[in-house]
Structure formats: structure tokens, C-alpha cells
């Protein structure tokens, strides 16, 4: 039996124990994990630096290096996420519905764990801890498969978490890392029916497509983020500039960063916006009108409208009205996060009704599409599909339900 099957068997057994634990037992284990991560922070950073150095040698893009790199601040954010998950209400056992039939049968629908979750992700070590904490809180065991570029970091994080669990009620086997990062091992993982209850891919378009096309295990799809902001004719100048700068520059390498800004052609502050972006080092790719009006704006190609740059690059386009903006977003968007900056309620209402996306914003940055920002604690991913879960996926997104039927001897006639 190879490494993967051994770990899958261990996960199955651990999931059975996890499903029976109390909220207090799970929270105590999460607190131990948070404390251990802080205690082992320097070692984790040393292991992460090995990955970062190797990534630079191999020519990883600045965006990927940024996602890969851990810092003191980022580890503290990860630990805060674990503690927040411990503080959140436990959805397991929650009564979703309850009713009594005319024949006296009392029926309850309650939340239960999914079982064993397989996480497939790229160079994001924070996902290792985020996924583990959310899974443990909801009584799920988790098989983690990160990228080879983050292997030192992931091994360190999983080691610290497993050691922290050894003195808790949660079996250490409830967290497993697939250290074989080969394509063959990944393909085997995608077909672990009977061991894994669901796969959750979290990463770029290529990774997600690979999982969807090759998996026989059910997939809970997360999506890439070609996010848009539409600046309406009535948008306040400083609000619009501040939101666009935040959505593009606060952290360009993440999926909720804005990639295209659509501007109403009659908005009076177009020059101020594009000149501010240019001064802040953003490479602008615009439609023919903008490219001919500003020497620092490159002519956009058709592919620019559908590109998730994950870098300080922004596509910009003038539109005649909110309908043209909506049509553009529905054509090129990835159903992730879309925003309108406007003081016209009718336009906001139309934007919200007409756009097919997981999260829509009025007068706010797209950067808020995040489990922690939504109050979920850490997130397992951001779903852009419509079945089971959509948007930032917190605790409830990785549960399912079962029905409990209480009778007094009823038989069906």
C-alpha cells in the first residue's frame, strides 16, 4: 500500500472519531495549534525561506513569490484565523429545520461533517493552516496536497499542527499532507472515491481545470478572480479613486484584486484616476479612446479583458452606461467579485440584479471577498459555482445535513 492509501485509511479512521467530539474538545485542540504555531514561528519561517529561495532560483513570478512567502505578520494573521475559528459557533449538530408530520413523526434536519476533505492548492502555505482549522472545527479530517514550491513550508506547518494534536482529543491522523507532489500522486488522489468525500481545489485556472477534468471524487470548485469595478457617472471622486487603488494595489496577487475598471464616459474625473494609478506604478491597458488620450496607457488586446493579472496591471475601458458595464462583466467576468461605485440607486439595483457573480459590492472594494472579512474566520476557499456553496466558504460550507426521524411506533400504510 503506497503513502497515499495509508494516509487515506488513517483519515477515514480519524474522521469517525472527529464526528463524535464535543465543541469544547475541538476548540481546545485548535487553541493548542495556535499556541504551537507561535512557539515554532522561527523554525516555520526558516523552512519557508528555503521555499522562497528555491522559488526565486526557479524563476517564479513576483506574484507567486508573494503568495509563497511567510512573514512574522502573516504567521500572526494565520494564528489569529485559527483562534477566530475556535471562537466561532460550531455548526455541527445545529438544527436546520424541524417539523412534525400529521402522523406524529417528528423530523429534524441537522448539520453533520462531510467526512474527509481533500484540499489541492498551490504556493499558499496559509491555506495549509486555514483548511486544517476549518476542517477540524467542523469534524472533518483533511488531506492536504500543496505545490512542490511550498513543500518545506507545508511539511513544517503540518508537523507543528500534528504535534499539537497529540495531547488533544483530536487524532493527529486527522491532518495528513501528501508529500509526493508528482502528477501521478495527484491523479491518484483525485480518484480516491470511498476515501475522500469531496475535493476542493484552490489556485489558478490551470490547477482548477486539472482537478475538474480528472477527478472522480466530487469537486467543490473555487474560481479565478477576473474582478471588475464600474465607476458610474455619479460616483464620488475620492471614493472611487480610493476604492480602485485599494482593490488593485493593497495585494495585487490575490483573487479578489480588481483586474478591470469600467468608467462611465461622462464621469468628470477620468484624468485624475488614471494619472493617480500611473503615478502609483500601475501599468494601464486601455481601450482605443483612452490609449489615444494618454501616452502612458497601452492599447488593450482582446485577451486583456479576460486576464487575471495578479500583478500591478489594470485594464481600463470607457462605457456609455451601466448596461454596457454589466454586459462586459457578464461576458468576461469569472463570477467572483464585482463592484459598482455610484450614487444612483436605480443603477445599483440593476447592477445587483443583472450580474451573475458570487459577491457584488456597492461603494466598497472587492478585497473584502474573504472569509475573515465576512466574519467566517479563515476560509476554505471562494466558490464561484452555484451548487452546495457560493462565495467565501466558511464553516457551514464544509458541512452537510442528515435527517433524524423520531417516531412512536408508526408504520407506513
UniProtKB/Swiss-Prot annotation:
Keywords: Amino-acid biosynthesis, Cytoplasm, NADP, Oxidoreductase, Proline biosynthesis. One of its GO terms (cellular component) is cytoplasm. Pathway: Amino-acid biosynthesis; L-proline biosynthesis; L-glutamate 5-semialdehyde from L-glutamate: step 2/2. It catalyses: L-glutamate 5-semialdehyde + phosphate + NADP(+) = L-glutamyl 5-phosphate + NADPH + H(+). The keyword Isomerase does not apply. One of its GO terms (biological process) is L-proline biosynthetic process. Its main location: cytoplasm. It is an enzyme of class 1 (oxidoreductase). One of its GO terms (molecular function) is glutamate-5-semialdehyde dehydrogenase activity. It is found in: Cytoplasm. Its EC number is 1.2.1.41. It comes from the Bacteria. Catalyzes the NADPH-dependent reduction of L-glutamate 5-phosphate into L-glutamate 5-semialdehyde and phosphate. The product spontaneously undergoes cyclization to form 1-pyrroline-5-carboxylate. Belongs to the gamma-glutamyl phosphate reductase family. This is Gamma-glutamyl phosphate reductase. It comes from Geobacillus sp. (strain WCH70). The lineage of its organism: Bacteria, Bacillati, Bacillota, Bacilli, Bacillales.
Amino acid at each position: 500500500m503506497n503513502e497515499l492509501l495509508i494516509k487515506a485509511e488513517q483519515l477515514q479512521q480519524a474522521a469517525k472519531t472527529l464526528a463524535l467530539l464535543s465543541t469544547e474538545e475541538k476548540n481546545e485542540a485548535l487553541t493548542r495549534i495556535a499556541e504551537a504555531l507561535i512557539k515554532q514561528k522561527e523554525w516555520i519561517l526558516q523552512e519557508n525561506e528555503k521555499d522562497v529561495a528555491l522559488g526565486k532560483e526557479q524563476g517564479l513570478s513576483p506574484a507567486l513569490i508573494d503568495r509563497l512567502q511567510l512573514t512574522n505578520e502573516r504567521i500572526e494573521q494565520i494564528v489569529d484565523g485559527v483562534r477566530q475559528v475556535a471562537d466561532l459557533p460550531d455548526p455541527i449538530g445545529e438544527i436546520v429545520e424541524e417539523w412534525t408530520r400529521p402522523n406524529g413523526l417528528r423530523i429534524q434536519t441537522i448539520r453533520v461533517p462531510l467526512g474527509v476533505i481533500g484540499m489541492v492548492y498551490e504556493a499558499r502555505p496559509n491555506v495549509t493552516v486555514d483548511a486544517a482549522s476549518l476542517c477540524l472545527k467542523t469534524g472533518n479530517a483533511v488531506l492536504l496536497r500543496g505545490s512542490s514550491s511550498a513543500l518545506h513550508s507545508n511539511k513544517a506547518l503540518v508537523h507543528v499542527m500534528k504535534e499539537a494534536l497529540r495531547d488533544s482529543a483530536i487524532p493527529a491522523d486527522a491532518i495528513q499532507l501528501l508529500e509526493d507532489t508528482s502528477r501521478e500522486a495527484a491523479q491518484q488522489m483525485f480518484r480516491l472515491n470511498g476515501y475522500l468525500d469531496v475535493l476542493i481545489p484552490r489556485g489558478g485556472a490551470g490547477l482548477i481545470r486539472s482537478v475538474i477534468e480528472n477527478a472522480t471524487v466530487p469537486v467543490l470548485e473555487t474560481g479565478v478572480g477576473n474582478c471588475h469595478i464600474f465607476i458610474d457617472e455619479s460616483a464620488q471622486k475620492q471614493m472611487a479613486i480610493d476604492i480602485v487603488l485599494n482593490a488593485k494595489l493593497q495585494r495585487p496577487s490575490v483573487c479578489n484584486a480588481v483586474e478591470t475598471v469600467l468608467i462611465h464616459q461622462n464621469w468628470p474625473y477620468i484624468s485624475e484616476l488614471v494619472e493617480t494609478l500611473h503615478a502609483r506604478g500601475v501599468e494601464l491597458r486601455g481601450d482605443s479612446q483612452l490609449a489615444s488620450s494618454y501616452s502612458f496607457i497601452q492599447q488593450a488586446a482582446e485577451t486583456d479583458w479576460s486576464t487575471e493579472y495578479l500583478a500591478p496591471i489594470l485594464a481600463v475601458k470607457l462605457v456609455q452606461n451601466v448596461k454596457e458595464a454589466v454586459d462586459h462583466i457578464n461576458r468576461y467576468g469569472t463570477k467572483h467579485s464585482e463592484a459598482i461605485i455610484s450614487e444612483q440607486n436605480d443603477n445599483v439595483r440593476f447592477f445587483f440584479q443583472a450580474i451573475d457573480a458570487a459577491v457584488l459590492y456597492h461603494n466598497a472594494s472587492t478585497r473584502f471577498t474573504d472569509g475573515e472579512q465576512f466574519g467566517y474566520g479563515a476560509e476554505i476557499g471562494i466558490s464561484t459555482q452555484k451548487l452546495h456553496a457560493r462565495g467565501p466558504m466558511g464553516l457551514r460550507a464544509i458541512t452537510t445535513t442528515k435527517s433524524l426521524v423520531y417516531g412512536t411506533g408508526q408504520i407506513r400504510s
